[in-house]
Amino acid sequence: MVLIGQTLQAYKGLSTEQLLLFVKALGFESCEINPAGTSLNNVEKIISKVGKMKLTFHLPIQGIEGYDFSQEDKADQINNVISLINNYGEKLNLLLAVVHPPEGNGNIEVLVKNLKKLNIPIVLENVVWYSNEEFKEIYEKLKIELGDQLKGWLFDVAHSYLRNGRKHYLDILDLLPFSELEEIHLSDCLEGEDSHYAFGAGILPIDEILREIKERGYNKIIVNEIDAHPTIWDVIDSYRKVARTFKKKLYRKVTFRLAITKPIIQAKLKKNKII
């Protein structure tokens, strides 16, 4: 059965643990966290809030944390993330970790060395700066190097759309083994920009995307990798849209809780000058 999540990191003064309470109150069933919002400094607070919710963990990337697992000169930061996952992963209910192929001056041997230190399954995400064929080559190399630790691959729809265009953004689903597709990232984007917008704020044909992955029988993890743009409420509506497509019961649950909690949440956000 599909597990539907939402990316969480600090937002306008709200910590990850505060946002976790927010999405739990709305009935969200899963979240994806990252080092930008989850560290050794606040992990105990997050654990106290997570309850039975299942989480995934996005390993650091240069665009957010300023480094990734393929950089030898970032050993201290990388080891902190490894320690976080290995020591607290079970208490965080972590299912898997998401990794990008090497960026910039990154080295794939360093990436492999660091990934092997993690006590958690790994999925490899397609990115804009690699062609489908290059991504497949790296994926197959990691399958050899990591063995069963590499659980599968992740399809980031916006990344593929920006790289391959309107006609070919779904081609990767036929190039790599669909049975090994373990996670999908959804968000809207602008032309030439990986915007992480809510659905409808950019150029992606989200209805077509949802229809395609449902018709293919996809039944694993979907994460809305969406920032609060245009508004927090658009993020919630995007989550409801995915739930309505794949899990009607979850859609009804979130819709009902939104009707009850929206005035309370709105008042708290206004009090903190967030909206």
Positions of the model-derived regions?
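Active-site beta-loop-alpha junctions enriched in small/polar residues
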Residues: 7-11, 34-38, 60-64, 102-104, ...
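Histidine-acidic metal/acid-base catalytic patches
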Residues: 1-5, 13-24, 78-86, 90, ...
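Short, contiguous strand/loop micro-motifs
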Residues: 6-7, 68-72, 126, 196-197
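Hydrophobic, well-structured mid-protein blocks that either form specific transmembrane helices
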Residues: 100-143
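Conserved N-terminal beta1-alpha1 strand-loop-helix module at the mouth
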Residues: 6, 11-43
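Structural motif corresponding to the early beta-alpha repeats
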Residues: 2, 29, 33-109, 159, ...
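Short, basic, helix/turn surface patches
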Residues: 54-66, 127-128, 152-154, 252
